[in-house]
Design a protein with these regions (language model features):
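Single-residue signature of alpha-solenoid repeat helices
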Residues: 67, 111-114, 150, 184
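Bacterial Sec-dependent N-terminal signal peptides
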Residues: 1-27
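TPR-repeat structural position
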Residues: 61, 104, 108-111, 146-147, ...
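Amphipathic alpha-helical repeat scaffolds of TPR domains
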Residues: 25-62, 66-105, 126-140, 165-171
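Canonical positions in the second alpha-helix
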Residues: 121-122, 157, 184
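Terminal, low-structured helical/coil segments at or just beyond the last alpha-helical repeat
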Residues: 128, 170-200
Length: 200
């Protein structure tokens, strides 16, 4: 029953958030109240990190059926701790996917609201952020009128994850730093983001 309630809240939240980013706090609080919070359980943190490693940091998408099964299992298991964090991440990704599928731009207010919540909640539970949150937050801020905050987010992310190719790419795109460009074309010329943004 609990899984059904959480699933319903997730579906409801996506349709609500498509219209208004400010409604997220109310729905999220309901999801959080259903979640078992455990600062020592790293399953969700590790899933976020693995998603980053396989989908963003890797030269090419290295998502495997095994990882997808692991993610699905965590989402469907009512005993998964810190599920509220995983739901926020999935809401963000679903919103982006739905916008792309419909040929529309994602809602910047929604993206920023989700990532702000995910950032603060993840810090509260784990005391630190996985790299994927810095990247998604930078993307969210970049979609809205918060360009200076993008630079700050990327710089903070690079302090924690100096080898993060996606963060280096976003830093280069915002600063046009020649040393970063050289690093990317010398050390990561085949990375999908370097190629996507035509960094040469």
């Amino acid at each position: 029953m609990k899984k059904l309630i959480l699933g319903t809240l997730l579906c409801l939240s996506v349709s609500i958030f498509a219209q208004s980013g400010s409604a997220i706090t109310t729905v999220f609080q309901k999801i959080k109240n259903q979640s078992k919070i455990d600062t020592n359980d790293r399953v969700v943190y590790d899933l976020m990190d693995e998603l980053y490693q396989k989908n963003l940091q890797a030269e090419n998408d290295e998502m495997t059926p095994e990882f997808m099964h692991k993610m699905e299992k965590a989402v469907s298991d009512t005993n998964t701790k810190n599920m509220h964090l995983l739901y926020l991440l999935l809401m963000y990704q679903q919103h982006i996917s739905q916008a792309v599928t419909k040929g529309k731009s994602p809602n910047p207010e929604f993206q920023i609201e989700i990532m702000s919540l995910l950032e603060s909640e993840t810090k509260e539970v784990y005391g630190k952020l996985p790299a994927i949150i810095y990247i998604f937050k930078a993307e969210a801020l970049d979609s809205g009128p918060k360009k200076e905050e993008v630079k700050i987010t990327v710089a903070n992310g690079l302090k924690e994850y100096p080898d993060s190719v996606p963060l280096k790419v976003y830093s280069y795109l915002n600063t046009k730093d020649e040393a970063l460009r050289q690093d990317l074309i010398k050390n990561h010329p085949n990375h999908w983001m370097v190629q996507q943004f035509g960094i040469k």
